[in-house]
């Protein structure tokens, strides 16, 4: 499998997709066309999303084709040279992907070796479920089941504490609730500016910040970039 699962598309004060572009370029080396899934877009159109991603990936010489333009999106996925799923609202994304039969189609392609790039919601749907998203459930998908390309859950945009003056639950408290109900599942708190790359049977944390790991019965712990992540495979 070849996966590049990115926490967030854009760092504060930077251009769209600027910080992950070098790694995306290395990951997609030799790829000329990518099939894009824009269904996480809610307050802007799929066409606008496609245009935004195309503007950035054109720097790599990659053409973007969005599944929203296809009469048969699943067929477009089956024929894809590479796949890309953008961020936005995870529930909207999952609902549309399920309706179009894309969850299973994407998993088959990933297992066949097709490169997959996702950020934020696009990383969430690569997991077994979407249960560790940060998003509001604005629509109801058929289920919480997702692509299942990896065996663990990701919480993108992971924050260590709440903003000053905020009295609600921390992200860690919410994840601890999840593992209480799902004791066999690992959860990776993927901080902004970081990503996970899965290639050649190896999982690697890329970025300048550690990743926080959670599992029932264990104290949460930090994993540094370059650490052995084979326990997640």
Language-model-detected regions and their locations in the chain:
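C-terminal and late-domain segments of enzyme folds
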Residues: 1-30, 41-51, 132, 136-233
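Portal/gating segments that form or line small-molecule/metal binding sites
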Residues: 33-36, 41-98
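Catalytic-core regions built around general acid/base machinery
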Residues: 79, 99-113
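Short, well-ordered alpha-helix to beta-strand connector turns
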Residues: 31, 80-81, 113, 150
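General beta-strand structural signal in soluble alpha/beta enzymes
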Residues: 5, 65-67, 85, 117-119, ...
């Amino acid at each position: 499998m070849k996966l590049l699962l990115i926490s967030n598309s854009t760092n504060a004060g930077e251009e769209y997709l600027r910080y992950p572009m070098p790694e995306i370029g290395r990951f997609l080396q030799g790829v000329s066309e990518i099939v894009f899934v824009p269904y996480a877009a809610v307050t802007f159109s799929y066409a606008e999303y496609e245009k935004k991603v195309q503007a950035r990936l054109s720097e790599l010489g990659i053409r973007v084709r969005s599944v929203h333009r296809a009469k048969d999106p699943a067929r477009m996925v089956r024929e894809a040279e590479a796949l890309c799923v953008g961020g936005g609202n995870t529930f909207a994304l999952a609902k549309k992907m399920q309706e179009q039969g894309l969850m299973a189609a994407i998993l088959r392609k990933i297992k066949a070796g097709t490169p997959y790039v996702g950020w934020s919601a696009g990383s969430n749907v690569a997991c077994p479920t979407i249960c560790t998203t940060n998003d509001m459930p604005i629509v109801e998908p058929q289920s919480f089941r997702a692509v299942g390309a990896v065996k663990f859950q990701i919480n993108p945009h992971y924050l260590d504490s709440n903003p000053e003056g905020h009295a609600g639950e921390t992200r860690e408290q919410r994840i601890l609730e999840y593992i209480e109900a799902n004791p066999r599942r690992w959860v990776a708190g993927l901080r902004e500016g970081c990503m996970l790359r899965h290639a050649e049977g190896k999982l690697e944390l890329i970025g300048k910040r550690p990743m926080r790991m959670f599992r029932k019965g264990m104290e949460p712990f930090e994993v540094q970039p370059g650490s052995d992540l084979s326990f997640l495979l």
